[in-house]
């Protein structure tokens, strides 16, 4: 299924290009193909550009959302305040600047709405089961980061045995899809900077610092809140003795879920991590260390072993 974050970018490029351009601009990705149509026709140039864009933001999209070009935002603010040439210093401008930054950066509120629209147009009618033991499986529990209803519709797994931790599609999931970074420290950092600027009566800095914090709040995914809201599912897992993880990159944003999962299940549980590439293998090794699993309690295996 075409459900990677790069597939999401392709969707935005086709159906919401203005939003995509605005968002990528926040991460120093310029839309040069708009300036010269020849770039779209030259596949080599386009492939090199796509590779650069992928590495800059989309390879680890959720983490990347918390790494906007803050320096550019701050420089932009400074140039505006300097152009005002205020005799009495940067005071009496906060409301005007707040309104301006809101107009500039509020667009990002539409991100999760576009995620929902993208997932709703993913078609499953050509999908076929790849693992027979999943079909009509009412013994295992499925903890999925995938927004689609493939487990419910293709494998016919009971909905009460599935947790779409980041939301999904109605009627299989009541919560809409969400994504975001997990860097709460960035938000706190800029709120503190805004407070200090306010104490120094520098309304220009106060305004832009709050604007940066607002941007990060709108792209933030509260993992603690996600887990607390779905506590009923986690409380069912006390007797789980085996955990198998496949198709996950073990990104920093989502590691708290696995830490909490370890807390909820049997202390003697065995873990299997399946990898597709050498990069996945290294990520699994890092996850094992972070989870503090003993050598005899886990295996790291090629993904082919899972599907056999």
Language-model-detected regions and their locations in the chain:
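Conserved catalytic core of sirtuin-type NAD+-dependent deacylases
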Residues: 1-45, 52, 141-144, 156-172, ...
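Gly/serine-rich nucleotide phosphate-binding loop at the start of the catalytic core
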Residues: 1-138
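SIR2/sirtuin-family catalytic core signature
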Residues: 1-3, 227-308
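Short, flexible loop segments at the rims of nucleotide/cofactor-binding pockets, characterized by
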Residues: 116-124, 219-226, 249-250
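A short acidic-Thr-Gly-centered motif at the start of a beta-strand
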Residues: 124-139, 152-154, 231-238
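Short, well-ordered beta-to-alpha junction loops that form the rim of enzyme active sites
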Residues: 145-148, 248
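Short, charged, surface-exposed secondary-structure boundary motifs
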Residues: 171-181, 281-284, 308
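Acidic, metal/cofactor-coordinating or nucleic-acid-engaging core segments within structured domains
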Residues: 185-238
């Amino acid at each position: 299924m075409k459900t990677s974050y790069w597939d999401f970018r392709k969707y935005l490029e086709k159906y919401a290009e203005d939003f995509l351009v605005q968002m990528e601009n926040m991460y120093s990705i310029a839309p040069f193909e708009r300036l010269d149509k020849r770039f779209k026709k030259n596949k080599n140039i386009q492939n090199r550009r796509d590779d650069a864009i992928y590495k800059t933001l989309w390879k680890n999209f959720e983490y990347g959302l918390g790494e906007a070009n803050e320096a550019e935002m701050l420089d932009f603010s400074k140039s505006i305040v300097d152009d005002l040439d205020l005799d009495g210093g940067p005071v009496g401008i906060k409301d005007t600047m707040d309104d301006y930054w809101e107009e500039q950066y509020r667009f990002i509120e539409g991100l999760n709405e576009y995620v929902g629209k993208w997932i709703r147009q993913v078609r499953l009618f050509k999908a076929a089961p790849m693992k027979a033991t999943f079909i009509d499986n009412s013994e295992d529990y499925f903890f999925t980061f995938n927004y689609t209803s493939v487990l419910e519709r293709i494998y016919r797994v009971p909905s009460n045995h599935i947790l779409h931790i980041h939301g999904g599609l109605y009627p299989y999931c009541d919560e809409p899809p969400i994504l975001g970074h997990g860097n709460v420290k960035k938000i706190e950092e800029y709120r503190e900077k805004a407070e200090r600027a306010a104490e120094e009566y520098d309304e220009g800095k106060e305004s832009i610092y709050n604007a940066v914090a607002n941007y990060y709040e709108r792209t933030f995914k509260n993992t603690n809140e996600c887990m607390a809201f779905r506590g009923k599912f986690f409380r069912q897992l006390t007797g789980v003795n085996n955990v198998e993880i496949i198709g996950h990159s073990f990104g920093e944003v989502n590691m708290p879920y696995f830490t909490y999962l370890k807390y909820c299940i049997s202390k003697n549980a065995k873990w299997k991590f399946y990898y597709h590439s050498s990069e996945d293998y290294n990520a699994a090794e890092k996850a094992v260390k972070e989870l503090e699993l003993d050598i005899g309690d886990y295996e790291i295996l090629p993904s082919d072993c899972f599907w056999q």
